[in-house]
Curated annotation (Swiss-Prot):
InterPro entries: Ccp1-like, Haem_peroxidase, Haem_peroxidase_sf, Peroxidase_I, Peroxidases_AS. Its EC number is 1.11.1.-. Keywords: Heme, Iron, Metal-binding, Oxidoreductase, Peroxidase. Destroys radicals which are normally produced within the cells and which are toxic to biological systems. It comes from Emericella nidulans (strain FGSC A4 / ATCC 38163 / CBS 112.46 / NRRL 194 / M139) (Aspergillus nidulans). This is Putative heme-binding peroxidase.
Length: 312
């Protein structure tokens, strides 16, 4: 057990959990980033609810949300870290895991401060439906992200997280990676989005996405994919200039992503001038069993229809 407050020790142990032979592309890094993202992206500025406080995915109301399907793996991978450092809250652990994963996969350093607390029951878990739906378009992205307090530039910067990981048909309904090296943080997502010919494809489950098939690729190689929301970034006149800038300038993208992600994981957190959290509506909670639905190997896919996606 480490000394309370030894976050460097926690960082080291998170980094030690990244290598996962047999899991997606051999790395837990992308799922740690998604865990930090989804645990923070429920924030609603108007009501000041949701956000990175609480670790609500420990409860069925949030953890069982189909939008969070697959994140049970990320939470399980971090349990040995929690057991070794029982003083850290889940909400701090999950957000820190995303920060460490991005840095370890070659991404920018992201400011992170501790102090989040965990819900002791599910009474403050935010309602479902606050996370982005990849089957939608530009209007949906603005509705979701403006609600949290982000602008168009920050929306595009955060979308660069799609340099990491892959989609799974039994989770989101979509299938495949965005880039050829989904465990290395880069600006490749933006380059591919602009330069490749993305063709619509309807999967066997009825979900529509966009794919690029390299004619020179080996037969066993998986085609790359883009979500309808990704293609909307390319086609929207206000989003596209940022896509173009990030495709050309990796350093600019890294700088903007770092700032936007730091803002994301602070949503719902109030601090004084010293950085101490001043939220008073929460106390530190203990361990809670993983939610039933999201404790299964895979969760149910989000409801999508080819007809709705085709309208984008």
């Amino acid at each position: 057990m480490s000394k309370p407050g030894d976050y460097n020790a926690v960082r080291r142990d998170i980094a030690a959990q990244l290598k996962k032979p047999g899991y997606d592309d051999g790395s837990a890094g992308p799922v740690f980033v998604r865990l930090a993202w989804h645990s923070s992206g429920t924030y609603d500025a108007a009501s000041d609810t949701g956000g990175s406080n609480g670790a609500g995915m420990r409860y069925e109301a949030e953890g069982g949300d189909p939008a969070n399907a697959g994140l049970q793996h990320g939470r399980a991978f971090l349990e040995p870290v929690k057991e070794k450092h029982p003083w850290i809250t889940y909400s701090d652990l999950w957000t820190l895991a995303g920060v460490v994963a991005i840095e370890e996969m070659g991404g920018p350093k992201i400011p992170w401060l501790p102090g989040r607390t965990d819900f002791v029951d599910d009474s403050k878990v935010p309602p479902r439906g606050r996370l982005p739906d990849g089957a939608q378009g530009a209007d949906h992205l603005r509705f979701i992200f403006y609600r949290m307090g982000f602008n168009d530039q920050e929306i595009v910067a955060l979308a660069g997280g799609h340099n990491l990981g892959r989609c799974h048909a039994d989770r989101s309904g979509f299938q495949g990676p965005w880039v050829n090296n989904p465990t290395r943080f880069s600006n490749q997502f933006f380059k591919l989005l602009l330069n490749m010919e993305w063709k619509p494809k309807t999967l066997e489950n009825g979900v529509s996405q966009f794919v690029y098939i390299d004619p020179e690729a080996e037969d066993h190689e998986e085609p790359l994919m883009m979500l309808p929301t990704d293609v909307a970034l390319r086609d929207d006149p206000a989003f596209r200039p940022w896509v173009e800038r990030y495709a050309k300038d990796k350093d600019l993208f890294f700088d903007h992503f770092s700032k936007a992600f730091a803002k994301l994981i602070e949503l719902g957190i109030q601090r004084d001038a010293s950085g101490k959290v001043t939220n008073t509506d929460n106390v530190k909670g203990g361990y809670h069993s993983a939610p039933k639905k999201s404790d299964e190997p895979t969760g149910p896919p989000r409801p999508h229809t080819a007809q709705r996606a085709a309208k984008l």
